Design a protein with these regions (language model features):
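N-terminal "arm"/small-domain region of PLP-dependent enzymes with the aminotransferase-like
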Residues: 1-30, 340
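PLP-dependent aminotransferase class I/II
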Residues: 8, 20, 36-43, 47-54, ...
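Conserved glycine-rich SAM-binding loop
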Residues: 59, 93, 342
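Conserved coil-to-alpha-helix start sites within the AMP-binding
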Residues: 92-98
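Short beta-strand->loop structural element characteristic of the AMP-binding/adenylate-forming
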Residues: 107-117, 304
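Active-site phosphate-binding strand-loop segment of PLP-dependent enzymes
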Residues: 114-185, 191-193, 197
Length: 363
């Protein structure tokens, strides 16, 4: 079976380096808030060309901390407003994005996507009072550059995929180092990257149970350990190589499968034609998803579905403003299928996956 994720292979390749990094971190005797956390935050600052980096326990908590900061700014600028701010989120993404804002007290509005799963542009980018956008880097695609990232009304989620230094970070970017991401932690981890010193100070205080403000506000305990950061620093040495390998695999599949888009039933690669893509997942759309899903798994290819439903269909979203059931995002959710995608795939496995998909549609 070609497993969907390459965690076992990556560990086998890096075992000695990871165990050595773990030993060095443990021998320091400082398991949190130590030198490896500092080193990793400095590396990430340089990688993203952003002045301030704050690590935390997960990408979801990173996004929630940004949301809590923006809510506090909203309350100062709208002292008599009885309504919380509103965040516009794409209807097709993992529920963690929505949960971060719900937990921070925001109103949530779900927005339809284009045919590649990226959120359509809303009026929020022009900065109306209390309205914000949160474009998500779904599957590794970068949100449209049409978003005015630097206007303070955009919060970016999913920046873990591309990790580039173009300066377009809006109010701040939330980054996840979940083990399935392009730059993975061995356990969990996240980060906030920003040019905003006030957001930086808020995040530093909030993640440490508000100790820096002498507990003048509430906070939480949200940290990456020294061991996590020591191990992820090992992986930073390979990230460029891994990203290039992902691009090569994606380009190969897009070439091999391109003609299937014009068949009935057909298949379309969602990364095809997307200019900036880090290929954290390789997702195809087909009206015959269930048939292809079963065929691939029966032939030793572990396919998965990301995601079988939209956020608007979840019980928690029953009162949210959202697209209708014939929207693009809902239609996508009924046909998306994820193929195994990781740098450790062999050339033979990449070719085998292509051959099996082609055989399915040529039968």
């Amino acid at each position: 079976m070609i497993q969907h994720f390459g965690l076992v292979r990556q560990y086998a390749n890096l075992k000695d380096e990871l165990l050595d990094a773990t030993d060095r971190a443990m021998r320091e005797g400082c398991l949190v808030d130590g030198p490896y956390v500092d080193q990793f935050e400095n590396w990430l600052s340089g990688r993203t060309d952003v002045q301030y980096v704050v690590t935390c326990h997960s990408g979801t908590q990173a996004l929630e901390i940004i949301a809590r900061y923006r809510y506090s700014v909203f309350q100062v600028s709208h002292p008599i407003s009885a309504m919380p701010p509103t965040i516009c989120l794409p209807n097709l993404t993992y529920p963690a994005t929505m949960n971060a804002f719900v937990n921070a007290g925001w109103n949530v509005e779900l927005v339809d996507t284009d045919r590649n799963g990226l959120m359509l542009q809303t009026g929020s980018v022009n900065g109306p009072a209390g309205n914000y956008d949160c474009p998500v880097g779904l599957y590794g695609a970068r949100p449209s550059r049409n978003y005015k990232y630097d206007n303070g009304y955009t919060i970016v989620d999913g920046a873990q995929h591309w990790l580039v230094s173009d300066g377009h970070i809006g109010s701040g970017m939330a980054i996840s180092f979940d083990p399935t991401k392009n730059l993975p932690s061995s356990g969990n981890g996240g980060a906030i990257v920003t040019h905003n010193v006030d957001l930086h100070n808020f995040a530093r205080n909030y993640k440490n149970n508000a100790k820096l403000s002498q507990h003048g506000t509430s906070g939480t305990n949200s940290k990456m350990s020294e061991q996590d950061c020591a191990q992820i620093l090992v992986r930073t040495k390979y990230i460029n190589e891994w990203q290039q390998r992902r691009r090569m695999i994606a380009e190969h599949w897009c070439r091999d499968l391109a003609h299937l888009e014009y068949q009935t039933p057909g298949l379309r690669c969602l990364s095809q034609g997307v200019k900036y893509h880090a290929h954290q997942k390789f997702v195809v759309y087909t009206s015959d998803r269930d048939g292809l899903f079963g065929y691939l798994n029966n032939n030793g290819i572990e396919a998965k579905i990301h995601y079988p439903y939209t956020l608007g269909e979840l019980p928690v979203a029953r009162d949210f403003k959202k697209p209708d059931m014939i929207s693009t995002s809902v239609m996508l959710s009924r046909g998306v299928l994820s193929l195994p995608m990781y740098p450790e795939l062999t050339d033979a496995e990449v070719e085998y996956i292509s051959e099996k998909i082609l055989a399915y549609y040529d039968k």
